[in-house]
Design a protein with these regions (language model features):
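Alpha-helical transmembrane segments and their immediate juxtamembrane cytosolic regions
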Residues: 1-352
Length: 352
C-alpha cells in the first residue's frame, strides 16, 4: 500500500489490485453500518456486518503480508512516524467532538501507545514487519504464530490495550500466511492462478462464498457473538472454557482463510481503468482518512434511516462507494500527502 500517487506500470497486478479495491470498500462499508447493527429490528444489518468482518480484515492483512518484501528500517520508521501523526490527529479530533478539557487532551496525547480505533492496524504493520524475519527461521512458522494467538487468548483475564497486542498477535497468522503464499508463488502467473481464475474456479469460489455467507447468517440468527471476529477479548471474557474458545478461534481462522481464497477466485483479473486501479494503490490513504467521515456519518444519520435495515444498508453501500472513490482521488491524496507519507531520511546516517 502506497499513500502517494504514482503512474500505473506494466507490473501492476490487476487481479490482486481489484481484490484490494473490494476489501477497502468492505472496510468503509462495514464501519458505516457498525454503530447501528444492534438496534432493534436491525438483524439484517448484523448479518451483513458479520459476513463482512469474517473476510475483510483477515483478507486485508493477508494482502499486507503478501506484499511484504523485507525488513527495511526506513519503511518501519516511516510507519512509526505515520502512526504517531495520526494518533495525535485522532486525539485532537476526539477532544474536540467530546468537548474534553485541555487536561483530557494532554492525557490522551501522553498515552500514544493505546491506539485509537482503526490505528491498531498501523501498529500491527510495524510489529509484523519486525517479527516476521524471526518467524521465518522457524520450521513451522504459521503453526507457531497460531499457537501464540491461541495462548494469548487463553489468558483468564483481560489483556492490556497497550499496542493492541491481543489483536496484533491474533491477526498475525493472516499476515504471515500472505507472505508464505507469495513465497511459494501460488498466486503468481502459472497453473494454480489459471485454475483459480478459470470459469470452473470462479463458479467454485462463488458457491463456497455464498455457502459461507448463508452459514454465517444462520449462525448470527442463532446468537453468534460478533465480538469473536474482533479478536480482542480472551476466552475468559466470553465466559467459555479454554478448549471451546480455542476451537471457535481455530474454526473462524479456517473459515476466514477459505473465504479469502474463494472470494479472490471471483475477482476479475482485467483492468477497469487507471482511475479504478488508483483505488487499489491508495488503500492506506483511504483507510486513514475514512474514519473521520464515518464518525460524522454516524452522528448525522436520521432515525428513519438508522432503524430501517434496507435504507441503512443501501445508503451505506452507496456512500462507501462514493467515499472510496473520493478519498482515493489524486487531489485528495495530494492535499493530505504530508500526513500520508512521512520522510524519515533525516533519521538515518548518510551512506557513502
Amino acid at each position: 500500500m502506497n499513500p502517494t500517487p504514482k503512474p500505473m506500470t506494466f507490473s501492476y497486478d490487476h487481479w490482486l489490485g481489484n481484490y484490494k479495491v473490494l476489501l477497502i470498500f468492505m472496510v468503509v462499508f462495514g464501519h458505516l453500518i457498525e454503530t447501528f447493527r444492534n438496534l432493534d429490528g436491525n438483524d439484517p444489518v448484523q448479518i451483513v456486518y458479520n459476513i463482512i468482518y469474517l473476510l475483510h480484515m483477515p483478507a486485508f492483512i493477508f494482502m499486507s503480508g503478501y506484499f511484504f518484501k523485507e525488513v527495511r528500517p526506513k519503511r518501519i520508521f516511516s510507519f512509526v512516524v505515520l502512526y504517531f501523526i495520526w494518533q495525535s490527529i485522532h486525539e485532537v479530533y476526539l477532544a474536540y467532538v467530546n468537548e474534553k478539557t485541555v487536561d483530557g487532551l494532554v492525557d490522551g496525547l501522553l498515552h500514544p501507545l493505546v491506539p485509537s480505533w482503526t490505528l491498531w492496524y498501523l501498529l500491527g504493520i510495524i510489529i509484523w514487519q519486525i517479527v516476521t524475519p524471526g518467524f521465518l527461521t522457524l520450521r513451522y512458522p504459521l503453526l507457531i504464530s497460531i499457537a501464540f494467538a491461541l495462548l494469548i487468548n487463553a489468558n483468564p483475564g483481560s489483556i492490556t490495550n497497550f499496542l493492541s497486542l491481543q489483536k496484533v498477535i491474533s491477526f498475525y497468522p493472516f499476515f504471515l500466511m500472505g507472505y508464505l503464499v507469495k513465497e511459494r508463488g501460488w498466486l503468481a502467473d502459472g497453473r494454480i492462478r489459471d485454475r483459480m481464475t478459470s470459469p470452473i474456479g470462479r463458479l467454485t469460489g462463488l458457491l463456497v462464498s455464498v455457502s459461507i455467507a448463508i452459514a454465517m447468517a444462520i449462525w448470527t440468527k442463532n446468537g453468534f457473538d460478533t465480538v469473536w471476529l474482533f479478536y480482542r477479548d480472551t476466552y475468559g471474557e466470553f465466559d467459555v472454557p479454554v478448549l471451546k474458545g480455542a476451537l471457535i478461534q481455530l474454526f473462524l481462522y479456517a473459515v476466514s482463510t477459505v473465504m479469502i481464497f474463494s472470494v479472490l477466485m471471483m475477482i476479475p483479473h482485467r483492468s477497469f481503468g487507471g482511475r479504478f486501479d488508483q483505488i487499489g494503490i491508495q488503500t492506506l490513504a483511504i483507510y486513514l482518512l475514512h474514519s473521520f467521515i464515518v464518525r460524522l456519518f454516524r452522528d448525522s444519520v436520521p432515525p428513519w434511516i438508522a432503524e430501517s435495515p434496507v435504507l441503512l444498508i443501501g445508503s451505506s453501500f452507496l456512500l462507501a462507494l462514493f467515499f472510496v472513490w473520493i478519498l482515493s482521488s489524486r487531489p485528495v491524496v495530494r492535499l493530505f500527502r504530508p500526513l500520508l507519507s512521512s520522510n524519515v531520511n533525516w533519521l538515518f546516517k548518510k551512506t557513502s
